[in-house]
Amino acid sequence: MLRSIQHVEALSSRQISTTSMLLKNRAGKTKSTSNRTQLLTYEMAQKPHHIGVRKSWLTWHSQNLEEFRQSQPLVVAQDEVVRRFIRGFFPQNLVVSGNEIVIKRRGNVLIVAGFLQYSRRLDIRRIYWMFGFAEEFLSILLKQPVKLEMAFVESEEDVAYNYI
């Protein structure tokens, strides 16, 4: 009898919450720094619920078509392979630490878009060779055509939309 009374008292005290609400529902919101030094690109500045309106070019894909459907784990693995290869093959030229690499699928073609930082040491022949090698290597590795659509910028400040 004594045990059941203690059990009932414990349950009744658990139902009353005396803490204040924290309202931690801020998904997709980047934290601001004290002296506004964190770089924010246009895509990072948009809120997650705008992805279908303002960022629709990031969501165009053909995975919902019957002929081009692939399993989700395969797509995630392919995306990770492509991102790691681009980060490893262009280490000095990445902008915003490679977070702005966009991978689009159109039919069976994989399109990799993003920004690379221009360096004075890079000549045109080497750039064309690196792009051709990266496209060919990824095409052979993934067994589907891969196209690189990389744009060169002078510095990371050219890509910056805002500083927070």
Swiss-Prot record:
Gene Ontology BP term (one): mitochondrial translation
Transit peptide: 1-23
Pfam families: MRP-S24 (PF14955)
Compartments where located: Mitochondrion
Keyword Electron transport: no
InterPro entries, sorted: Ribosomal_uS3m
GO MF terms, alphabetically ordered: structural constituent of ribosome
GO annotations of cellular component type: mitochondrial small ribosomal subunit
Residue ranges the record marks as coiled coil: none
Predominant subcellular localization, coarse grouping: mitochondrion
Signal sequence, renumbered to the chain: none
Family statement: Belongs to the universal ribosomal protein uS3 family.
Subunit structure: Component of the mitochondrial ribosome small subunit (28S) which comprises a 12S rRNA and about 30 distinct proteins.
PANTHER family recorded: MITOCHONDRIAL 28S RIBOSOMAL PROTEIN S24 (PTHR21244), SMALL RIBOSOMAL SUBUNIT PROTEIN US3M (PTHR21244:SF1)
Protein name in UniProt: Small ribosomal subunit protein uS3m
